[in-house]
């Protein structure tokens, strides 16, 4: 079957946009084809710095013929209805329609509309230019003399050529006939800008790939990544070094080159006195190069990696001198950048962190929430308050919190913001701060995401909790909350961080008092937003536990009870409830609860009031009523005592004992008895069952 080959050749596309653009191209073209009834066998998109390409395999030569019967008005209908039917069906008169009789509706007109399938080539010529003109680049530009004209093409960088061919592999494909802003789709593309800049004639995808390879272009981004990674590892191995792999950098570099050539450079060993993270950030950010690791650990490095004074660079050029000039040029730039970093390192060390704190008055955290200096004061107070909860020394927690943001005004963090916290730890260690304080300065930002490590040091946990709760309460107090997919201040991440910190430390930190303490630092009353923020935590806890296999409805069932703000106890209760419902007794108890709840809902609606009074034992007529009442009293008391003792497994066992008397009650007892007093008493007994389950969870929230 015929294939489509499409290539859009332009100036350099930013690396960060290439993957998304290739996927957008694939989806836009294939969706447009499917909408028009053209199915295909497979589609794959490609990207390089200078081109987007798409191969769609297994398309039909033409679309299928369509036969449609369109029902019209009744025979004898008003003229306006008849004329509207004729116009919509494309008929000249009613003579072209059929009359169909319906036993119930009488006779009515039916138009038979037959549309022959369109040639695929014609459809492609229609949809491709429209897709190119409306392509969803995050940023785009106009260029050339035509740029001032209305409706001028916008592209990420100037578009120079379009290849668009369609046809079977066994025949010569045809050109898809269309033009976009003077660019005629054809068979001509171009190779590597320097190594093979001449035109290349391509007709089909099977010829396209090898033609580009001969022209020094590797079309597939994943293959370019594999080449870079393989060659970089080989170069490092040959020198007895290890490559420090970096997936983000690898993805970016693969988007900067069409013909990757991997080379090795070096820098003066004296620069290794700089922290390895600084060397890595310098070489990565400025030169897009990979650093190398020395094979043996340095005892003085305190567990941190020891880098080698060498780096891997990736060129887009196979130079005649073997890359010597390219390496020398990169080494000059790396030397200059590392010299700057060394200057920052030596300058920053001269000023203790505590002496930098006044400068935080000049940094605005948020226009509604004040400066970083004010924030540091709030975090320090919270960290001291939280310290006993997590087993930290209050003085160390407060000290760490006061120094936690001091590195924001250092030269190094000013140049490399991603090193905040880490540089604070280095400077704190050098000025003799306790290890727990230094570690907390680095770790208080953690966890930065679902996969990030959670701090375990008590001081680190105290400061991290204080930092995140201050952020959450602050933004809630000024009504700057996440909405939909928008979360500019990463508040969802902060809430998830609090949850993971609390659970990881096994900390008993009731949220409502903690939120009140944080609100006090902002001069705000938490009453206006505490419930909403607690609900936000519940939603984040659902996400966290669901990722671990827990049921979201069980979390709802526990949070529906009043006063559930102790995250550790909520999780323990959810886990115990899940284990109960995994048993036969639990499943049957839930079924009995639902039966009782359904009866109560119907009867309470009918009666206009709740049946939540205590049942009268004197009105029990059957032994099953007495047995259930006694079981409910015993189970409720046992469950409440177990919950008070935080023995949630015991509470669930107490409820599980209700299964047999509940089953027997529904087997033998008619709730809606003819005697009104007996009916009332039996409904009260069901109300007691509903109340008893509330000792552990709101069973009405449980699904399934």
Swiss-Prot record:
Q: What is this protein called?
A: Glycine--tRNA ligase beta subunit
- Name the family: Belongs to the class-II aminoacyl-tRNA synthetase family.
Where is the protein localized?
Answer: Cytoplasm
* Disulfide bridge positions per record: none
Alphabetically sorted, this entry's keywords are: Aminoacyl-tRNA synthetase, ATP-binding, Cytoplasm, Ligase, Nucleotide-binding, Protein biosynthesis
Task: Fetch the NCBIfam families from UniProt.
Answer: glyS
Taxon lineage: Bacteria, Pseudomonadati, Pseudomonadota, Alphaproteobacteria, Hyphomicrobiales
Organism for this UniProt entry:
Methylobacterium sp. (strain 4-46)
Q: What is its EC number?
A: 6.1.1.14
Looking at the UniProt record for this protein, which Gene Ontology cellular component terms does it annotate, in alphabetical order?
Answer: cytosol
A Pfam family (short name) is: DALR_1
Q: Which gene encodes it?
A: glyS
The protein's annotated catalytic reaction(s) are: tRNA(Gly) + glycine + ATP = glycyl-tRNA(Gly) + AMP + diphosphate
Q: Which SUPFAM superfamilies match?
A: HD-domain/PDEase-like
Could you provide one GO biological process annotation from this protein's UniProt record?
glycyl-tRNA aminoacylation
Molecular function GO labels: arginine-tRNA ligase activity; ATP binding; glycine-tRNA ligase activity
